[in-house]
Swiss-Prot record:
Changing N310D: In strain: SK1, V1-09, YJM269, YJM270, YJM280, YJM320, YJM326, YJM339, YJM627 and YJM1129. It comes from Saccharomyces cerevisiae (strain ATCC 204508 / S288c). GO terms for molecular function: malate synthase activity. The keyword Transcription does not apply. Malate synthase which takes part in the glyoxylate cycle. MLS1 activity is essential for cells to grow on oleic acid as a sole carbon source. Two steps of the glyoxylate cycle take place in the cytosol, the splitting of isocitrate into succinate and glyoxylate, and the dehydrogenation of malate to oxaloacetate. However, the formation of malate from glyoxylate and acetyl-CoA undertaken MLS1, occurs in the peroxisomes when cells are grown on oleic acid. It catalyses: glyoxylate + acetyl-CoA + H2O = (S)-malate + CoA + H(+). Its main location: other. Keywords: Glyoxylate bypass, Peroxisome, Transferase, Tricarboxylic acid cycle. SUPFAM superfamilies: Malate synthase G. This is Malate synthase 1. One of its GO terms (biological process) is glyoxylate cycle.
Length: 554
């Protein structure tokens, strides 16, 4: 049994005791209380060894894939779970019955208010890919959620007043996405190791808000990212059970939707729902991360080279198969099957281009509705009416009753050949342009970045980096020039893009394009491959102090 104790726990930041968003009096000190820290430290000590073992297991799978002796497939040892038609997910939770339009975004105070005021059903508040994990972003995200749930989030800036449109009980249901199992929070050390970022984000939010959310007629609801194995879902389930027992609420109060955004997880969808069981609220199609994971896990196999990113769509064979299997799986088990992101943002100065972009969104949502999804994501409040218009055609709060008849095989999930797919110089430029712009903003503390009229998050930068690594590694030939993709070519174009973007930057010489390029270069030359850009760059945004805070004074 793990003892509840803050011995050998070091908090390497000052704890703000002054409110930052008046008239609210909430401070960081109200979040980092002694009892809240004891709770997250207990969870970390109980589950961290298992977390690390599961991360090591990912690399075991990668080595087997790289050797060519192993191919991804449905797990024989869990066939009994897949073949048992009797088990189901739980009864749908209050506030999670109709999820036809979900908005997403980081927990910045203004964005939180705008999202809660949007004409949507649910709001995925994101500590993960659309947030740069600076200490202030993470801890003030907790402050902002604490205030929103207590109807005290309104605040003024010199240019604008931000106010909720009513009682939060009647506004969109909040679903929090903590950081993935692979990330750590280096501002808080437990037993000489940084605490799991997943447990930090989940634990603080749950500890302070679970009972308040139940009073609102909702509950502590989560989105779980980046999982690659059903045992990683079991780990979350174990965390949930301990957390609910600790604060004295019934097991099954927590609900979690899992993003199927890694290739290995696509072969274990039923097992993931099964492991969460009473806590499951379905699965979601995380399209860009799924493409990133497909390239990452198959990067050394010349049979799985993807073309220019704009040619990899939701109707590409391997993507279409994954979507159809997800919907069939979820609905057979009685849980939601959520669609993917519409990343478009309004183009205010070009009505024709804006209409074209909105038509693309509408067509994408129609495809999702027709396939059988129960709802979908938008990145901007202006897109919510389009999603609403489409999904109102369900005529019901969801379409879980509709089980599409389709058989998706392991071979279908690995069918990465895209008809008429091409790799061109423009594809290299586009990957470098998007990757550099996103990384530069992330290093400055922004994880939700408008680029070329799309709201981009970390997944799109990951695709950029992986594609370039893969094209260099396999020496592909460019369709437009006949030139071979080499480390020298990608480095040359990288330097050109850095120069162009630096000159155009409104920050002048304070921009971080050179720093972004330093990390990008060995990856796009094919010299190294990091599991995640976010972990690669993380130390650049950590801001710890030498002397730990005295926890007895919290």
């Amino acid at each position: 049994m793990v003892k509840v104790s803050l011995d050998n726990v070091k908090l390497l930041v000052d704890v703000d005791k002054e409110p930052f968003f008046k008239p609210s009096s909430t401070t960081v000190g109200d979040i980092l209380t002694k009892d809240a820290l004891e709770f997250i430290v207990l969870l970390h000590r109980t589950f961290n060894n298992k977390r690390k073992q599961l991360l090591e297991n990912r690399q075991v799978v990668q080595k087997k894939l790289d050797s060519g002796s192993y191919h991804l497939d449905f797990l024989p040892e869990t066939a009994n779970i897949r073949n048992d038609p009797t088990w189901q997910g739980p009864i749908l939770a209050p506030g999670l019955i109709n999820r036809s339009t979900e908005i997403t975004g980081p927990p910045l105070r203004n964005m939180l208010i705008n999202a809660l005021n949007a004409p949507v059903n649910t709001y995925m508040t994101d500590f993960e890919d659309s947030a740069s994990p600076t200490w202030n972003n993470m801890v003030y995200g907790q402050v902002n959620l604490y205030d929103a749930i207590r109807n005290q989030i309104d605040f003024d800036t010199p240019r604008k007043s931000y106010k909720l449109n009513g009682n939060v009980a009647n506004l969109p249901t909040i679903i929090v996405r903590p950081r993935g199992w692979h990330m750590v929070e280096k501002h808080l050390y437990v037993d000489d190791e940084p605490i799991s970022a997943s447990i930090f984000d989940f634990g603080l939010y749950f500890y302070h808000n679970a009972k308040e959310l139940i009073k609102l007629g909702k509950g502590p609801y989560f989105y779980l990212p980046k999982m690659e194995h059903h045992l990683e879902a079991k780990l979350w389930n174990d965390v949930f059970c301990v957390a609910q027992d600790y604060i004295g609420i019934p097991r099954g109060t927590i609900r979690a939707t899992v993003l199927i955004e890694t290739l290995p997880a696509a072969f274990q969808m039923e097992e993931i729902i099964y492991q969460l069981r009473q806590h499951s609220s379905g699965l979601n199609c995380g399209r860009w991360d799924y493409i990133f994971s497909t390239i990452k896990r198959l990067r050394n196999d010349p049979n799985h080279i993807l073309p220019n990113r704009n040619q990899v769509t939701m109707t590409s064979p391997f993507m279409d198969a994954y979507v159809k299997r997800l919907i069939n799986t979820c609905h057979r088990r009685g849980v939601h099957a959520m669609g993917g992101m519409a990343a478009q943002i309004p183009i205010k100065d070009d009505p024709a281009a804006n209409e074209k972009a909105m038509t693309k969104v509408r067509n994408d949502k129609i495809r999702e509705l027709t396939n059988g999804h129960d709802g979908s994501w938008v990145a901007h409040p202006a897109l919510a009416p389009i999603c609403n218009e489409v999904f109102i055609n369900m005529g019901t709060p969801n379409q879980i009753y509709f089980i599409p008849e389709n058989v998706v095989t392991a071979a279908n999930l690995l069918e990465t050949k895209i008809p008429n797919g091409e790799i061109t110089t423009e594809g290299i430029v586009q990957n470098l342009d998007i990757g550099l712009q996103y990384m530069e903003a992330w290093l400055r503390g922004s994880g939700c970045v408008p680029i070329n009229n799309l709201m981009e998050d970390a997944a799109t930068a990951e695709v950029s980096r992986c594609q370039l690594y893969q094209w260099v590694k396999h020496g592909v030939t460019l369709k437009d020039t006949g030139e071979k993709v080499t480390p020298e070519l990608t480095e040359k174009i990288l330097k050109e893009q850095v120069e162009r973007l630096s000159k155009a930057s409104p920050l002048g010489d304070k921009n971080k394009f050179a720093l972004a390029a330093k990390y990008f270069l060995p990856e796009i030359r094919g010299e190294k491959f990091s599991e995640f850009l976010t972990t690669l760059l993380y130390d650049e945004i950590v801001s710890t102090k030498a002397t730990p805070t005295d926890l007895s004074k919290l």
